[in-house]
């Protein structure tokens, strides 16, 4: 295992990152989901968790917000554990689309109708692959899986769920299109409801760092010492995060920062330095690709100072 940075160093770098970017007001909240548009854009929280279970925080790390697309990583992890990694390749795809996260064109352009599990089309299809005889059973298993990563019981932000359910016509169209190509593996209404619910799960910055630390520790939870995933599946999840975690900006992120990462339009980003640490940052203002601007800058700074680039 790679050596984790020392405690005083990590906390000092978190403090520096917070003060360096706390006055950055560039970007704006996601506005196509009304509940997200209302979130205070000034929130800024940073958290790091090491494979040894040490937790370092700065800023608004206890403020709940919706996990949004960061949930896709953990749903992918469960699907891999249940179905095996080759099923993901065969039934979803793992190549970057190079297009927006909610693109329909990505499906049409690929003759195999292959996308990846970290864009909306692939993520909704991944939900349809999960075990569960009905909506209640499938959601119960998925939410329990999230709880294991967070090491606590998580809940759904019902206002976000309602807001997204009322505005998810585009995702429904994606699911119907996938169904027409035999690339969707269950009832559209049922699986779209679960997907929308997973995106509405409430987390804090600290929660996300704890959840991502399982990937930094090769599938073993640093706080419980329990193995949640096989090491092979961890490697594959991190690979997809590297190529598609920040949507059409993923290549630039890999070039600049060099860490597997995943963003969400709620303002969170997680990044993983295998064997060293996981970092999560929350700041609601986004760039045009749907990635938090301050979170990107803060993680870039932290990764550089901790010499964490994996390439």
From Swiss-Prot:
It catalyses: L-glutamine + H2O = L-glutamate + NH4(+). The keyword Cell wall biogenesis/degradation does not apply. Keywords: Hydrolase. Gene3D superfamilies: DD-peptidase/beta-lactamase superfamily (3.40.710.10). SUPFAM superfamilies: beta-lactamase/transpeptidase-like. It is an enzyme of class 3 (hydrolase). It comes from the Bacteria. Substrate binds at residues 69, 120, 164, 171, 195, 247, 265. GO terms for molecular function: glutaminase activity. Its EC number is 3.5.1.2. GO terms for biological process: glutamate biosynthetic process; glutamine catabolic process. The keyword Secreted does not apply. Belongs to the glutaminase family. Homotetramer. NCBIfam families: Gln_ase (TIGR03814), PRK12356.1 (NF009020). This is Glutaminase. It comes from Colwellia psychrerythraea (strain 34H / ATCC BAA-681).
